[in-house]
Amino acid sequence: MSTINNTRDIKNVMVRKASGEEEKFSTKKLIASLERAGADFDVIDHIVNDVHSWIFDGVTTRKIYDRAFSLLRSNKFATASRYGLKKAILEMGPTGYPFEHLISRVMELGGYSTQTGIVVDGFCVTHEVDVIATKNKQQVLVECKYGQSAGRVVSVKVPLYIHSRVNDIIRKRQTLPEFEGFSFQGCIATNTRFTTDAIDYAKCNNMWLLAWDYPVGQGLKDIIDRERIYPITVLNNLNKAQKQQLMEVGVVVCRQIHAEPKVLDSLQLTSRKLSALLNEVKNICG
């Protein structure tokens, strides 16, 4: 059996990211992503050596991902599902509604009670807030920016705009007796990334940002992997139409299926297909 060299990168091989930027290929990054997906040593060893055998200058990170996913899938279904997390979130569209519910679940894991898609009064005008999260007289007003392209970035224009909206809502709520003693904070959540200017502006104005890999170690991918709140779009035993049907009735994360398998009744799956799906869900949720 071959072994992985954990310290060696393929020297001078440049890969192209979804944004069009180029960076040196890192074996360490590939290993880390496979470990997060739950792949065991032998599977990681096989995939890394496979990638080393064909990687070339200018190859896209998507091509590397697709190859790794294919090899994972041939070894372990649930592991492949978790490795496909970024792609799965990109498949939650075309509307941002399922993503809003995913973010709502993330906030609930932090001890917040949540509401989604709420129209509220500001001091000057009314506003629709994607997620309102409340805990111990602290209220977070969340704007969700869902992107269906991995290369998309959220520019400084977004926190500039959201900051003014949040301030209008806060100004109104500070006049209402039911919000006496409350503190408020604006938040922007995205499945993509923020520009440096967007991050700087948000920090300067006490806004909470949540992106795919921001804050470092506490980004969306980290929370989902740690808490195992995977969207149903990771599931290999459901087709696109079936996933869409479930999301339309509010079934957005695998935990919902794990807790209440009856939500699948409307799909009219065969007993064999249902058994395979529930087994995949069980393995994913842990």
Which residues are covered by each model-predicted region?
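Amphipathic alpha-helical repeat elements characteristic of tetratricopeptide repeat
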Residues: 45, 97, 237-240
